[in-house]
Structures are given as structure tokens and as C-alpha cells.
Amino acid sequence: MVVRARHTVPDVERDWPGFVDMPPVLATAMMIGFIEQTCIQALRPFLSEHQRTVGTHVDVSHVAATPVGMRVTAKVELIDVHGRSLVFRVACFDEGGLIGEGNHQRAIIDLARFTQKVAEKAAKASADSAG
């Protein structure tokens, strides 16, 4: 991934004013999203068409700033499997070296079942707020 302005701290979320005047470097949230995307893509060939994975835990340090225009790479290694739970060792690098590392956990889900549960949760919340 090449860091663009939209990946920087000031552009993460304009509704959160604390970010607006921060330096324009790769946002931690974007680095985590890139790690998740890399894990998703690494797992895709091993899942059925009815399965996906969802992030369940992130323990990653962001140790160096990356300016706009630099290329970032993510390396992920599946280090543990417990049933549907998958644990990855992850690291991100820019052209200057290591920028982040840690562990990321994902869970394998059945897409239809998961989507149904989310719809039920949304319907209940809507009914509760209306009542």
C-alpha cells in the first residue's frame, strides 16, 4: 500500500476534532485496517464461499511514523488455531523499516448466520429505541 492523504491521522475521521491538527502520517487505525486486509486475503483461499473471518482482538504497537508517499507492506503469519479462532503474528514495514508489530486474532464465521444475528440485533435496538 502506498500511503495517501486519506490514510493519515487528520483524515481518519473529521467528526473527531482531536485528529484534525495532527501530523499527516499513517494513522494507526489505517495500519490496523491494512493488517486485517492482509489477513483476510491470506485466508480467503482456505475458506468456503459461505465463510468469512472477523477481527476479534488486536495487540499491535505502532512504533514509527510513515509519511505520505511511502510504501507500506504487511507480513502476517498464522501461528495458532483454536477451533474457529486464528492467531496471527503481524508486522508492518515502510521503506525505512519496521513501523508496527504484534498479534491479531480473527474468527471464522458462517456469513449467513452472522448476518442474521446482526440484523436481529439491529431490529431489537430499533424496537428498544422506539418503545
Regions found by a protein language model. Give the residues of each.
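Hydrophobic beta-sheet segments that form the core/acyl-binding groove
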Residues: 60-95
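Short beta-strand edge segments in extracellular beta-sheet folds
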Residues: 2-4, 93, 105-109
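C-terminal output/interaction extensions
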Residues: 105-131
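Short, well-structured hydrophobic secondary-structure segments
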Residues: 26-46
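Catalytic strand-loop segment that frames the active site of acyl-thioester-processing enzymes
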Residues: 1-26
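Short capping/connector residues at structural and topological boundaries
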Residues: 30-31, 52, 65, 104, ...
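Hydrophobic beta-strand-centered segment that forms part of the acyl-chain substrate-binding groove
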Residues: 39-73
